[in-house]
Amino acid sequence: MSLATLDATQHPNLPASAATLFKAKAHKKLSFEQIAQHIGRNEVATAALFYGQAKASPEDIQKLSELLNISPQVLEEQLSGFPDRGRSVEMPPKEPLIYRLYEIVQNYGYAYKAVLNEKFGDGIMSAISFSTKVEKETDADGNNWAVITLRGKW
């Protein structure tokens, strides 16, 4: 199994907590799925904590401290503030996978908007009252497909 790691030189705008968490994750050889199971979040929400894009609860801090052997005081200091969302990614993104997600919104954004407006009326989908997940599907020919679900309150 390959594990996501952090190359801080490619992410100069991440908070200090990112380096702390990724170093412990690598040392323990844990996947985001394993960490998510321990803290009771899904794996994308857990990864968002590591990148400083989500707010950690006191329970998250306690459970991460236990699992990763990081002082709760260090995690409290690094994770208890409000996230500075969105500053970690340059626009347009240069990383190919992140660029493809950006490209999906460029190509399908207005189509999503039109269909959502027809189904729900005027409004927006929340990114606060929101959840997302990633699943892997394999078709009959053995091809792997990524399935990304976005669920936001209207």
Curated annotation (Swiss-Prot):
InterPro entries: Cro/C1-type_HTH, Cyanase, Cyanate_lyase_C, Cyanate_lyase_C_sf, Lambda_DNA-bd_dom_sf. SUPFAM superfamilies: Cyanase C-terminal domain, lambda repressor-like DNA-binding domains. Its EC number is 4.2.1.104. It catalyses: cyanate + hydrogencarbonate + 3 H(+) = NH4(+) + 2 CO2. The active site is at R100, E103, S126. GO terms for molecular function: cyanate hydratase activity; DNA binding. It holds the Pfam family Cyanate_lyase. Keywords: Lyase. GO terms for biological process: cyanate metabolic process. It comes from the Eukaryota. It is an enzyme of class 4 (lyase). Catalyzes the reaction of cyanate with bicarbonate to produce ammonia and carbon dioxide. Belongs to the cyanase family. This is Cyanate hydratase. It comes from Aspergillus fumigatus (strain ATCC MYA-4609 / CBS 101355 / FGSC A1100 / Af293). The lineage of its organism: Eukaryota, Fungi, Dikarya, Ascomycota, Pezizomycotina.
